Amino acid sequence: MKEQAYIPQPLDTSAIVLPKDLDVLTEQLAQNVHAVWAAGRVADGWTYGEVRDDVRKTHPCLVPYDQLPESEKEYDRRTSIETLKCILAQGFTILKQ
């Protein structure tokens, strides 16, 4: 059987604008995205290292979120923002109780 190349088709969320009242949630989700990623790495035997080394299993981003470089925080924020936009695009409402 011939394998077909995977062609990603993410939901188009370009028209979705997140309300400002979701800014705090966006940052909290970004922090959690990092924590989940880091926990997975640590569980697999990775530790902090100044440079990423796949053989030694070291990674410079195995630090608390507030110690990440801004570029890494922005990566996690983009993941959070796209997740929230996808939820809204599907017709859900996000309400804090």
Enumerate the predicted regions with their spans:
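Alpha-helical propensity feature that highlights long, continuous alpha-helices across diverse contexts
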Residues: 1-97
